[in-house]
Amino acid sequence: MIQMVPIYSCSALLRRTIPKRPFYHVLSGLTVRFKVNPQLNYNLFRDLTRREYATNPSKTPHIKSKLLNIPNILTLSRIGCTPFIGLFIITNNLTPALGLFAFSSITDFMDGYIARKYGLKTIAGTILDPLADKLLMITTTLALSVPSGPQIIPVSIAAIILGRDVLLAISALFIRYSTLKLKYPGRVAWNSYWDIVRYPSAEVRPSQLSKWNTFFQMVYLGSGVLLLLYEKEEGCEKTEEDFEDRKQDFQKAFSYLGYVTATTTIMSGVSYALKRNAFKLLK
């Protein structure tokens, strides 16, 4: 009995090195006797191994994704905080909203740093991290711009931020489907589509411009929550004579920061559209 490795993980020269005499292979307890013809050996062996690893994804040697490590736990905690941030902003509970937003911003830096420094980078992390960023940006932008809320962000800037993230989300869903179909033929189903741990198909590669854009968006949205909190606290005290002057200065700086953020958002969206290696197909 001879135990062989999957055909798709071997060199292309394997086709010419398959012996010209009968040999055997064991898959799931089934002994298969190969033909003498090398080409038939290659085709039969390829089909059997692909079928074996498609029906038993846990055996696939390329799965390197692990969900529960420290960086991914930080990312998941950021996702869990996101709906509460939006709720607190809408209900004018600005102190906990600012605290959770600051926590989310810090963990966004920490998870990537820990993953790179300690070799904990995973396929799941490359997908969950930008997903957490998009959820945080979309939720906070909506909460700060809807008419029923404080509406401190202009509609034009909110439309730019939301439009880019929605388009990226749609493209990510399409890329996930197409790469899953290529990597796991016949295994594209609802459960496998959302199971990025057992069925990883692509790795997200954000550009440096995208990282800077995320930074500016976090500073801009965090400043919006801070401005609302400042107006609320100072408005209640009404002890400072120059309150209105400081408020106008703060609002002016916030407006300029909004223009910068809108510019980087547009540039980042264009770079994603033109960049060919924003997503890497896993082999």
Swiss-Prot record:
Disruption phenotype: Cardiolipin absent from cells. Decreases cell population growth during growth on the non-fermentable carbon source ethanol. Sensitive to thermal stress.
Main location as per UniProt: mitochondrion
UniProt GO BP: cardiolipin biosynthetic process; intracellular monoatomic ion homeostasis; lipid biosynthetic process; mitochondrial genome maintenance; mitochondrial membrane organization; phospholipid metabolic process; protein targeting to membrane
Annotated thermal dependence: Optimum temperature is 45 degrees Celsius.
Claim: Cytoplasm is one of the keywords in the record: no
InterPro entries: CDP-alcohol_PTase-I (IPR050324), CDP-OH_P_trans (IPR000462), CDP-OH_PTrfase_TM_dom (IPR043130), CDP_ALCOHOL_P_TRANSF_CS (IPR048254)
Residue intervals passing through the bilayer: 83-103, 155-175, 209-229
GO cellular component: mitochondrial inner membrane; mitochondrion
Compartment(s) where it occurs, according to its Swiss-Prot or TrEMBL record: Mitochondrion inner membrane
Reaction(s) catalysed by this chain's protein: a CDP-1,2-diacyl-sn-glycerol + a 1,2-diacyl-sn-glycero-3-phospho-(1'-sn-glycerol) = a cardiolipin + CMP + H(+)
GO molecular function: cardiolipin synthase (CMP-forming)
Recorded topology in the membrane: Multi-pass membrane protein
pH profile of the protein: Optimum pH is 9.
Family as reported in the entry's similarity comment: Belongs to the CDP-alcohol phosphatidyltransferase class-I family.
Miscellaneous comment in the UniProt entry for this protein: Present with 876 molecules/cell in log phase SD medium.
Subunit-level organization: May be found in a large complex.
Protein's UniProt name: Cardiolipin synthase (CMP-forming)
Organism of derivation: Saccharomyces cerevisiae (strain ATCC 204508 / S288c) (Baker's yeast)
